[in-house]
């Protein structure tokens, strides 16, 4: 298991680059249709303790692979990843999530 990066801040462009580089593999392996960054990294308000918040849309149901996707992304990012399925956004959080949303792929 990789050691997560708690002392070094990644930048938004670095995160977007990692996600873009890995998108084709994620689409094939996990049926990822789209990825979007939101939260503190999207707003450039991250701290060393911040996780990477990602909104994911899948091309088909993925079941437990959802959890494996988070693990797969934590390795290249060196940060804890918090995934949210696009169809799982609670109505009371929709506006705040969409306010900081940065579409990464495709």
PLM segments and residue spans:
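Conserved histidines in hydrophobic membrane contexts and catalytic metal-binding motifs
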Residues: 37
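Short beta-strand->loop micro-motif that forms the acidic, two-metal-ion catalytic signature
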Residues: 53-56
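Catalytic core of pol beta-like nucleotidyltransferases
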Residues: 1-34, 43-48, 58-106
């Amino acid at each position: 298991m990789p050691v997560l990066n708690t002392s070094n801040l990644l930048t938004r462009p670095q995160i977007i680059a990692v996600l873009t580089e890995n998108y084709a593999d994620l689409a094939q392996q996990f049926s990822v249709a789209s990825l979007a960054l939101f939260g503190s990294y999207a707003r450039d308000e991250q701290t060393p303790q911040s996780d990477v918040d990602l909104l994911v849309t899948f091309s088909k149901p993925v079941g437990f692979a959802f959890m494996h996707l988070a693990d797969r992304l934590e390795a290249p990012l060196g940060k804890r990843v918090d995934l949210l399925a696009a169809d799982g956004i609670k109505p009371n959080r929709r506006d705040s999530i969409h306010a900081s949303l940065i579409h990464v792929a495709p």
